[in-house]
Amino acid sequence: MGLLDGKAVIITGASKGIGRALSLRFAREGAAVVCAARSADLVKETTAQVKAAGGRAVAVVCDAAREDEVRRLVAAGVKEFGKLDTLVNNAGDGGVTKPVQDYSMEDWRYTIDSCLTSSYLCTRFVVPEMIKVGGGAIVNISSGAGRRGLPYRIGYCSAKAGQVGMTYGMALELAPHNIRVNCVAPGAVEGDRIDRVIAGQAQVRGISVDEMRKAMIERSPLKRMVTADDIVDATLFFCSDMARSVSGQVLAVNAGEPAG
């Protein structure tokens, strides 16, 4: 018996990294997975990997920051699996690394839409489907940057803080419908994205990439970065019946890094 047997889940940002790891693990735990991402090639690759491992999945090419595309995403999930009762809002691009005085409106809108508007839209259109089946679980993948900040990443910090506030508000609003809403706030996650962040931070601070990476690791009491699997484990807990009485919570998965 898997922890998600009988569940039907949408996972956004399922093209690679955390999203791909979520898709593979959730399918192994018994969920039928709607893999959504902007890149057709990558999201189809994720879905192929899920199916090759014996899981159930469908790929939907979708920009989760566009209302019409999210409507189509939800309709496709219901058509394929008959219902939707779980949502992981994982989509989001960290945007550029710049001083605030150089951060353009285009930079701002892109990052807010990618990280925050996408979570709002997916939740808006999935909630009616959850109500139909008597409840569900929503997990927003935020970031430690939304709680403690990160220099030169004002759009990303703001969007991720918005996801935390959204989690609190939706948990209260949706509780009467038996819909639980929680949030996972990763620290630095090993992979291509953190490599780009480190490079950008090093450039604006005038230090080497190696120095920036060392400083980031030293900030963590456990002296390491976290992995995609660490984030998957936390998300799986929130989506499973193990967390049946847990809602409105933010779980920091950050190797012990303080929030403030």
Where are these regions (language model features)?
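Conserved glycine-rich Rossmann-like NAD(P)H-binding loop of the short-chain dehydrogenase/reductase
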Residues: E29-E45
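Residue(s) in the substrate-gating loop at a strand-loop-helix junction
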Residues: S143
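Substrate-binding pocket helix/loop in short-chain dehydrogenase/reductase
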Residues: K98-V100, S104-I112, M216
